[in-house]
Regions:
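Histidine/acidic-residue-rich catalytic or RNA/ligand-binding cores of hydrolases
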Residues: 12-15, 144-145, 167-172, 198-207, ...
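An N-terminally biased module of ancient metal coordination in phosphate/nucleic-acid-related enzymes
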Residues: 1-54
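Active-site gating/metal-coordination segments in enzymes
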Residues: 53-139, 146-148, 187-196, 274
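Catalytic pocket-lining loop regions of alpha/beta-barrel enzymes
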Residues: 112-223
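A generic "structured core" feature
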Residues: 1, 5-7, 117, 121, ...
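Conserved, mostly hydrophobic/aromatic
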Residues: 4, 36, 59, 91, ...
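Mid-to-C-terminal alpha-helical segments outside catalytic/metal-binding sites
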Residues: 1, 25-43, 218-220, 234-275
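Hydrophobic faces of well-ordered beta-strands that scaffold small-molecule active sites
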Residues: 1-5, 44-47, 71-74, 99-101, ...
Length: 275
């Protein structure tokens, strides 16, 4: 299962938010489905990209096209007056199973982690069995484990916690992430190694981080293609090469099955696949 991809456009049908930090080329559902077919991937999770803000229409249209194949992670306002409980229920019926909170690209970073807003969102989605997906640099939060140890929902951290390889695995924030994994509080997406190291494939600087999250809790790991790889300034490898990279980083077949099949079925509420 591909647990991290975005659909963007066509912009004529799904226009981007005026306040955005980049403008992606169209990355349509049809193009993504062609990629899934090429990779022989049957299920996928579509994550709301920041260029759409809280307008989830493009993602929801993709979910509607094949409810058996797709799940979604939405972005909503933290104000309960803006999004009603019925609207949350409608998102659930459409296939949404989590909310994304982008801490990296917020306009004002001086206020620190918006913990009260995150907790309010978590309390609202807890009855639905959803999770919060956090895009944040965990190295900026040395008290990460203490902050989230009693959060009411599971947390999903993208891009190995989005900590650059130069910080090393002993970084306090990354160690906090490992602690949350060990205590069944956090999941980690094994995505975007090219975003957090300076080298090219096979991203050897990221191998210690990969090994650390596997050791912490292999049942809390999921994988994603990160398609269409927005805002990546270095040369991108072929998506099939990223799949092959997982084979080398998780060499045990039962471990790969957990990462690619069993774990995401649990997190995203997919029916278990028959063996």
């Amino acid at each position: 299962m591909d647990c991290h991809a975005h659909v963007c456009g066509p912009a004529t049908l799904f226009p981007y938010a005026k306040e955005r930090i980049y403008t992606p080329p169209d990355a349509t559902l049809e193009s993504y489905q062609a990629l899934l077919k090429m990779l022989r991937v049957n299920r996928a999770v579509l994550v709301q990209p920041s260029v759409y803000g809280t307008d989830n229409r493009a993602m929801l249209a993709a979910l509607k096209s094949n409810p058996q194949q797709f799940r979604g992670v939405a972005v909503i306002s933290s104000d309960p007056k803006v999004v009603s409980d019925q609207e949350l229920a409608d998102l659930h019926a459409a296939g949404v199973r989590g909310l994304r909170c982008n801490i990296v690209d917020i306009a004002d970073k001086s206020a620190g982690l918006p913990i009260d807003q995150l907790r309010n969102l978590a309390n609202r989605i807890q009855p639905l069995g959803w999770h919060l997906e956090l895009l944040m640099h965990v190295n900026e939060y040395p008290n990460l484990a203490k902050t989230f140890e009693e959060f009411p929902v599971d947390l999903v951290f993208g891009h190995f916690g989005y900590v650059h390889a130069k910080h090393g695995i002993d970084d306090k924030g990354f160690q906090g992430l490992l602690e949350l994994m060990k205590n069944q509080r956090a999941w980690v997406k094994m995505t975007g190694p090219y975003r957090i190291c300076d080298g090219d494939l096979p991203y050897v600087d990221m191998r210690p981080f990969n090994d650390a999250v596997i050791e912490a809790n292999p049942n809390r790991l999921i994988w994603g293609s990160d398609w269409p790889h927005v805002m990546v300034k270095k040369q991108m490898p072929h998506d099939a090469d990223l799949c092959d990279l997982l084979d080398s980083w998780a060499q045990d077949s039962s471990l790969r099955n957990s990462i690619l099949v069993d774990n995401p079925c649990i997190l995203y509420d997919f029916p278990a696949l028959k063996s």
